[in-house]
C-alpha cells in the first residue's frame, strides 16, 4: 500500500510539470513521461499516451520499483523501467523527467556513436545539484534508441552506477532524461540542459 496523500502531492507535481514543459515546447503532443517518488517502494508516473500539457489527476498512476502497476488498470509508459532504475540506484532522487525537445533530439543525433556529450566551461553547469564550479565537466552519455526497454534500462543502470555524479542522459533521436531530489530540482535541470544544448548547437553552427 501507499499513502494516498503523498500520491496526491506527487501527482499534482507531475501535472504542474507537464504544463510547464509543454508550454516551453519541450514535451509536444503525447510525447514524454514524468514521475515522482511516493515512498521507498512506489512511484507516481504518467499514464501512457496522455497529452502532457493537459494532464489531470486521472492521468497519473502508481507503479512499484519494478514497473508494475499498483491498484490500477491503466498502462504506464513503455519506458517506465527507465524511471524505476534511477529510483533504485539513487534513494535520494524524488523525480525523473523525460522530455522530447527539438534541441535535445537534434543534438543527440549529432554526437558520434560511442561518444558522450561533454559540457565544460559553462557557468550554468552550477545549476545542477552538487556542481560548484564551471571548471568541472558534465558528461552526458548518448544511448542508442531501441524498443528493447529492459535492455536499455540495464545499460543505463550500468553506466550510472559507475558515474553517479552525472545528472542525465540522451537517447539518440529521442530525447532527454534527468532527475533530482525534488521536482523543482528536476525542472531546473531540464532548463539548464536546454540552455547548454542550445549553446552546443550554436557553437557547432558557428564552427562550420
Curated annotation (Swiss-Prot):
Belongs to the aldolase class II family. MtnB subfamily. One of its GO terms (cellular component) is cytoplasm. Catalyzes the dehydration of methylthioribulose-1-phosphate (MTRu-1-P) into 2,3-diketo-5-methylthiopentyl-1-phosphate (DK-MTP-1-P). Its EC number is 4.2.1.109. It holds the Pfam family Aldolase_II. It comes from Marinobacter nauticus (strain ATCC 700491 / DSM 11845 / VT8) (Marinobacter aquaeolei). Gene3D superfamilies: Class II aldolase/adducin N-terminal domain (3.40.225.10). One of its GO terms (molecular function) is methylthioribulose 1-phosphate dehydratase activity. The lineage of its organism: Bacteria, Pseudomonadati, Pseudomonadota, Gammaproteobacteria, Pseudomonadales. InterPro entries: Aldolase_II/adducin_N (IPR001303), Aldolase_II/adducin_N_sf (IPR036409), MethylthioRu-1-P_deHdtase_MtnB (IPR017714). It comes from the Bacteria. GO terms for biological process: L-methionine salvage from methylthioadenosine; monosaccharide metabolic process. Pathway: Amino-acid biosynthesis; L-methionine biosynthesis via salvage pathway; L-methionine from S-methyl-5-thio-alpha-D-ribose 1-phosphate: step 2/6. Keywords: Amino-acid biosynthesis, Lyase, Metal-binding, Methionine biosynthesis, Zinc. Binds 1 zinc ion per subunit. Coiled coil: none annotated. It catalyses: 5-(methylsulfanyl)-D-ribulose 1-phosphate = 5-methylsulfanyl-2,3-dioxopentyl phosphate + H2O. SMART domains: Aldolase_II. Zn(2+) binds at residues 98, 100. Its cofactor is Zn(2+). SUPFAM superfamilies: AraD/HMP-PK domain-like. This is Methylthioribulose-1-phosphate dehydratase.
